[in-house]
Amino acid sequence: MIIFTWEFPPRIAGQLAYYVNRLAAELIKKNVDVYVVTYNNSWTGFHQGADGIKAFRISDKVQPQINVLTWMLSLNQEAERVAADIYYSMKHELDLIDVHDWHFIPAAVTLKRALKIPFVFSIDSIEPHRSRNNSGPLSSSIKSIESLGMAETARILVKSEWMKQELKRYYNASDNMIEVVSPAAESWIDGILATYQKLLEVPAN
């Protein structure tokens, strides 16, 4: 499987980097073959750490960028290329993508439609919480990408019941599409794997 994340050690912008690093490490312990595709403008290419995590770090080929939206949309092209390379190197054995927050949703949707790979949309935060002006054009575009992800995903993963209710409030997300798995729970990784397994039993649309 592939994990898409816009932050991953050593590039750390917040708690998401630590969470994804922990997730990948725990999946490896459960014998899941996992690749992390992430952004790093100063350290690019493939690297496998001592913990077994296989990471592809990509950079933005288009400079300069005018805002976070143009930056991420151009970066998605690189994410798609790397994911396709992984898919073909694995002889089409790539089963699932887990996308963390909105940044790589366009790539996940493209790969779902082109290669029939389902994806999970793991949501750590949403635009109405991040932006002070979430009715402006930039925030409206990001919210549209988040809505696209929720419409196209096979399942939404959140860390709390509160976030589940926020998705229903702001995006009218379907209750039965949202799984709550708290990273504080002792059986956290088993809950994640149970969600993954359910999706592998249903072909991508």
Describe these PLM feature segments.
Residues M1-T44, Q48, E186-Y196, L200-N205:
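N-terminal subdomain of nucleotide-sugar transferases
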Residues W6, I123-I126, S182-P183:
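Histidine-centered beta-alpha loop that forms part of the nucleotide-sugar donor binding/catalytic region
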Residues D33-K91, V180-P183, I189, L193:
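A conserved catalytic-core segment of Leloir-type glycosyltransferases
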Residues V109-R130:
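Active-site proximal beta-strand in glycosyltransferases
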Residues L138-I156:
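Membrane-proximal helix-turn-helix segments that form the acceptor-binding/catalytic region
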Residues K164-A184:
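Helix-loop-beta element that forms the nucleotide-linked donor phosphate-binding surface
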